[in-house]
């Protein structure tokens, strides 16, 4: 039996009035985005010593754990670069300060982040931008191995940005190779893309929109006999990528989730009275089609507005997205926690978080961004764990990714010494996402959530002076399906 003793990074301690059986553990996705482009969240600036970069990343993960989150979404590809050891794209300038230069001493930030996140019972989702090839505020010279140098035929300039042309199959294939490599080599829990598909429009000095320069790929499509209008063709280019990403992720590892975080308004007038940017016509993102057809495992529309903004009201937009989710995938909206102190208070963020639940047909929330939570702006983290995040939660199950529960764990109990009782766990075969231990004392159940690779569990000999009456241990599969419990009752 494998005996790996993990006491550190114990993830939850929840007290409940003792019912006849243990209470169900809450299921809710609670995450934050960790943005690396422009050093928004991490690292705090480029060129830092590796030890400092690692310490900053650990501190962000500690923040997620402190505020009872269960996932982080780490940006690992900002613009056809890599914040990990990639055989396909150059190192990001946001690490070393120069694109293509590996960190010294050598380390792999994504592998490090996965290990550290999982030790804290946090899922790690790798976030990438599928088409952006060069950020407008990038400073470093372009590395020789960057796609704009190796395949300039795939890249167009638009304003101060470079973009892979979505109309070229080879552009999409390049991104798909990156996705497949990420899922294959790293023990990540999700692949995540945001709202950047075709770019947000650039404007001239007179304020008129600048056309996106895809004439070459559009002409090739027409010569091939294509019949779609140019807007429909652009939307289908994005649809093709989304479908292919979903397939690529699940082909490599069926349990890894694929998520999309589109702009929060599909089209003006949906629902009635809503105004704002038309992503369907401007970004060529048909997000309603994606959520209706279940083309991803979770959707996180960026609902960055307040309840006071009647033309973009949070509650109305949340209800609309929920009504479109006919494929019953996860709906985990993003909210603008970074706006605290500008246009909203922490109380509003807590209120928005509190709207998530069965009544709104949503089961999670993602906070933009990590820095706001780390700074505990206006006490937002404190208020969350005193309110909607008071109890720790498991990530909701994704049964369409695998509905088979793990086998009931086998346990062995040890009483050696004067320390805690130990329960050794034989969890059988397969990757596990969590181990749940529920202990019944005299008046309450205690629920603890451990990392999925935990194989030895300490159980106090007494809790508030009372020996445990019953201990139940369950395991969760990677898609979040819970096993039957192993039960120990002291004699």
Predicted segments with their positions:
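Substrate-binding cleft of secreted/luminal carbohydrate-active enzymes
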Residues: 284-288, 292-310, 321-400
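Aromatic- and acidic-residue-enriched segments that line the glycan-binding/catalytic groove
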Residues: 82-97, 132-158, 195-224, 270-278
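Catalytic domains of carbohydrate-active enzymes, especially glycoside hydrolases
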Residues: 55-81, 185-189, 295-296
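Aromatic-lined carbohydrate-binding/catalytic grooves of carbohydrate-active enzymes
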Residues: 67-105
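Conserved aromatic anchor
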Residues: 419-430
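Active-site-adjacent "subsite" loops/lids of carbohydrate-active enzymes
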Residues: 27, 35-55, 126, 131-185, ...
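Beta-strand-rich modules
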Residues: 461-483
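Active-site neighborhood of glycoside hydrolase catalytic domains
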Residues: 170, 174-178, 184-185, 189-193, ...
């Amino acid at each position: 039996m494998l005996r790996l003793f993990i006491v550190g990074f114990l993830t939850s301690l929840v007290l409940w009035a003792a019912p006849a059986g243990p209470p169900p553990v809450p299921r809710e996705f609670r995450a934050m985005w960790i943005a690396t482009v422009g050093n928004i969240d991490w690292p705090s600036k480029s060129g830092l010593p590796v030890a400092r970069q690692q310490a900053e990343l650990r501190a962000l993960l500690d923040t997620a754990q402190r505020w009872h989150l269960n996932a982080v979404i780490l940006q690992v590809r900002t613009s056809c670069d890599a914040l990990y050891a990639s055989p396909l794209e150059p190192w990001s300038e946001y690490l070393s300060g120069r694109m293509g230069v590996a960190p010294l001493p050598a380390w792999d930030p994504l592998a490090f982040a996965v290990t550290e996140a999982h030790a804290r019972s946090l899922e790690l989702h790798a976030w990438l931008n599928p088409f952006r090839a060069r950020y407008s505020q990038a400073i470093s010279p372009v590395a020789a191995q960057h796609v704009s140098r190796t395949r300039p035929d795939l890249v167009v300039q638009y304003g101060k940005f470079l973009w892979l042309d979505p109309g070229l199959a080879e552009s999409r294939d390049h991104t798909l190779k990156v996705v497949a490599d990420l899922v294959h080599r790293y023990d990540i829990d999700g692949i995540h893309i945001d709202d950047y598909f075709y770019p947000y429009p650039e404007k001239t000095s007179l304020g008129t929109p600048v056309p996106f320069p895809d004439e070459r790929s559009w002409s090739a499509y027409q010569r091939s006999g294509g019949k779609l209008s140019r807007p429909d063709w652009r939307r289908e280019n994005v649809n093709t990528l989304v479908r292919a990403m979903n397939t690529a992720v699940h082909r490599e590892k069926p349990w890894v989730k694929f998520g999309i975080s589109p702009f929060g308004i599909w089209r003006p007038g949906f629902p009635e009275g809503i105004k704002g940017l038309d992503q369907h016509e401007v970004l060529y993102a048909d997000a309603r089609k994606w959520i209706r057809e279940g083309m991803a495992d979770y959707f996180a529309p960026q609902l960055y507005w307040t309840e006071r903004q009647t033309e973009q009201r949070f509650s109305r937009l949340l209800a609309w997205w929920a009504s479109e989710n006919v494929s019953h995938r996860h709906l985990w909206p993003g909210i603008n926690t970074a706006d605290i102190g500008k246009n909203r208070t922490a109380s509003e963020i807590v209120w928005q978080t509190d709207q998530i639940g069965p009544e709104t047909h949503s089961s999670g929330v993602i906070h933009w961004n990590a820095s706001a939570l780390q700074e505990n702006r206006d006490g937002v983290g404190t208020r969350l764990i005193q309110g909607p995040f008071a109890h720790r939660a498991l990530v909701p199950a994704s049964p369409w990714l695998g509905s088979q529960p793990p086998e009931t764990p086998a346990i062995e109990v040890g009483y050696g010494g004067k320390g805690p009782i130990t329960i050794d766990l034989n969890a059988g075969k397969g990757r596990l996402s969590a181990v749940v231990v529920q202990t019944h004392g005299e008046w309450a159940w205690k629920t603890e959530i451990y990392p999925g690779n935990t194989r030895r569990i300490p159980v106090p000999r007494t809790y508030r002076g009372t020996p445990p009456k019953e201990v139940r241990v369950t395991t969760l599969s990677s898609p979040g399906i819970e096993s039957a419990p192993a039960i120990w009752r002291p004699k």
